[in-house]
Amino acid sequence: MVLGVTTTERWWPSPFGPDDQHGMLNLVDEAKRLEALRLVREGRMYDLGHELHEDIPVFPGRFFRQTLVTTAHHANADGGVGDNDVNWVTEQVAATMQLGTHLDALSHLQIGDRGYNGCTVSELAGTAGVRRLGVETVPQVVTCGWLVDVSARRPGPGDVIVVEDLGGVDPSPGDAVLFHTGWSARWDDPARTSRASLVPATPWPSSWSSGRWR
């Protein structure tokens, strides 16, 4: 994420057309998916998601609350209900959706009043959600990936990921680049991962040059 940068550059309309809602994911086409599948040798999977719980680090004002509900709660009883003594466990969740491990939709960020494809906030925002660029428009993604490990740098406050950190990475159009920053080691330390102001709350921002690198 690039913060603390202003620009007067007009970035719309998108090269994919003024009505596009997929952004650079347009480059993940059938040929790119087949290229990615040909790279598979062992079939291993890696979970990139963190567990959601009430003490996860969040932006100020955001929250996650989960309440377990069982048949016993409903029936005020110790066992199940009916002739077959059936029981069940469900949960009630109240949360800000923009927390934990997630994928940002193109509607999430704007510079001033303009977001992707020049959409204004008033054009995007409806009373029950966004009118355009919502996460429901994001296509399924199967593509080639590059992992860049910058965790050994142990950055101080205000340090950013710069082009020089990218080393010999040479992605082609449609590839995904993932950064291992080491920040996950602080996941269970809300005092380190939550801040009262926007910029310090965003660990390891990238520089403007690395954001535009490809």
Where are each of the predicted segments found?
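Active-/binding-site microenvironments in catalytic and ligand-binding cores
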Residues: 1-214
